[in-house]
């Protein structure tokens, strides 16, 4: 049984979720991110615009659409470059390095790969919206996503999986959660200062929020991931591989998620009374992300639905 997660703060959703959803689908079509009609149907039932609306409920309309477009791009390329394809192919390294090059050079390569122009579009708009330093917070998270994908691939190519501790290190970066959290202040009261953002207590809050999203996803996506061809080790699967039953593994991960929620809230309540208005907004934005992701899974998306495992888990036949 897949557990539910409760939070000591309320849900929220941007009032323009439907517009963000329509805009994200149009963005994907415009940039050639939709390989087939069946894939279009998958995107429609996944509802990435609603994820943006729940995670950034107070964003202005420009940032909301930007995040919705970024989400639909990210999930598509993450599935087709890493998760739902063969563990390693001749395209893996060129695809991932092209994404880093867009960040480093701010231009497409000589022979752009699938999704590269869409990624440049997202980055160009984010650069215009954010300060240079703020954009680099986001960019660092994306560089780490592409780089740690190599560690994730190496783990799946080995004779056995690594244990949970090194898996946690890989997971917090391959998830793509950190770049999303780096935008939490932009969606509230404006950017926190570099000193605030990089301070140990604030980075500890970011770590707790990241763990909540990643580890809860590991139980919610478990059935889908166990059927993926290239990437199938997650926290629950590793615990089960080490001797627990699958349900015991799920329950243990859920217990750890609840511990992270409690630790986040305890630290946040200590920090907030003395924080600046932007920092209070950032902390609240982290709350929106944790709760918003859970509400999206429970109410909106069919990304992890049992009914679509056979259809969605394996993208090795998708041509890009």
Curated annotation (Swiss-Prot):
Please give the cofactor(s) recorded in the UniProt entry for this protein. Mg(2+)
Q: Site (Plays a critical role for substrate recognition): which residue positions?
A: 79
Q: Which GO BP terms, alphabetically?
A: terpenoid biosynthetic process
Q: Which residues does UniProt assign to the signal peptide?
A: none
Plays a critical role in the stabilization of intermediate cation, annotated site positions: 75
Extract one GO molecular function annotation from the record.
metal ion binding
Bound cofactor: record note: Binds 3 Mg(2+) ions per subunit.
Spans through the membrane: none
Could you tell me which Pfam families the record lists for this protein?
Terpene_syn_C_2
**Binding residue positions for Mg(2+) 1:** 78, 83
Disulfide pairings: none
**Amino acids binding Mg(2+) 2:** 83
> What does the UniProt keyword field contain?
Lyase, Magnesium, Metal-binding
Task: Give me the reactions it catalyses.
Answer: (2E,6E)-farnesyl diphosphate + H2O = (+)-corvol ether B + diphosphate; (2E,6E)-farnesyl diphosphate + H2O = (+)-corvol ether A + diphosphate
Question: Where is the motif DDXXXD motif annotated in this sequence?
Answer: 78-83
Positions contributing to substrate binding:
171
Residues engaged in binding Mg(2+) 3: 217, 221, 225
The record's comment about this protein's domains reads: The Asp-Asp-Xaa-Xaa-Xaa-Asp (DDXXXD) motif is important for the catalytic activity, presumably through binding to Mg(2+).
As for what it does, the entry says: Catalyzes the conversion of (2E,6E)-farnesyl diphosphate (FPP) into (+)-corvol ether A and (+)-corvol ether B via a 1,10-cyclization, which requires isomerization of FPP to nerolidyl diphosphate (NPP) and then abstraction of the pyrophosphate from intermediate NPP leading to a (E,Z)-germacradienyl (helminthogermacradienyl) cation. The preferred substrate is (2E,6E)-farnesyl diphosphate (FPP), however geranyl diphosphate (GPP) is also able to produce small amounts of several acyclic and cyclic monoterpenes, with linalool as the main product.
In the record, the note on similarity to other proteins reads: Belongs to the terpene synthase family.
Q: What is this protein called?
A: (+)-corvol ether B synthase/(+)-corvol ether A synthase ((2E,6E)-farnesyl diphosphate cyclizing)
The scientific name of the source species is Kitasatospora setae (strain ATCC 33774 / DSM 43861 / JCM 3304 / KCC A-0304 / NBRC 14216 / KM-6054)
């Amino acid at each position: 049984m897949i557990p539910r997660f409760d939070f000591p703060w309320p849900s929220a959703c941007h009032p323009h979720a439907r517009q963000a959803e329509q805009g994200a689908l149009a963005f994907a079509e415009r940039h050639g991110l939709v390989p087939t009609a069946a894939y279009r149907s998958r995107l429609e039932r996944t509802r990435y615009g609603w994820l943006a609306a729940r995670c950034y409920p107070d964003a202005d309309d420009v940032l909301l659409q930007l995040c919705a477009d970024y989400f639909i791009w990210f999930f598509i390329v993450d599935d087709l470059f890493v998760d739902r394809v063969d563990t390693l192919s001749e395209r893996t390294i060129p695809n991932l390095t092209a994404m880093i090059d867009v960040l480093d050079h701010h231009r497409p390569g000589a022979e752009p790969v699938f999704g590269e122009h869409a990624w440049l579009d997202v980055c160009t708009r984010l650069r215009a919206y954010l300060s240079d330093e703020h954009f680099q917070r986001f960019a660092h998270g994306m560089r780490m996503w592409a780089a740690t994908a190599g560690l994730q691939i190496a783990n799946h190519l080995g004779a056995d999986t690594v244990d949970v501790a090194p898996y946690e290190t890989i997971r917090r970066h391959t998830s793509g959660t950190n770049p999303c959290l780096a935008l939490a202040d932009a969606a509230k009261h404006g950017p926190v200062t570099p000193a605030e953002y990089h301070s140990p207590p604030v980075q500890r809050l970011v770590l707790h929020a990241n763990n909540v999203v990643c580890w809860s996803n590991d139980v919610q996506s478990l059935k889908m991931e166990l059927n993926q061809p290239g990437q199938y080790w997650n926290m629950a699967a590793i615990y089960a591989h080490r001797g627990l039953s699958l349900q015991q593994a799920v329950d243990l991960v859920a217990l750890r998620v609840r511990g992270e929620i409690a630790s986040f809230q305890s630290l946040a309540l200590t920090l907030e009374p003395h924080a600046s208005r932007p920092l209070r907004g950032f902390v609240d934005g982290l709350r929106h992300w944790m709760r918003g992701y859970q509400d999206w899974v429970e109410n909106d998306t069919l990304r992890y639905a049992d009914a679509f495992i056979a259809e969605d888990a394996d993208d090795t036949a998708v041509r890009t």
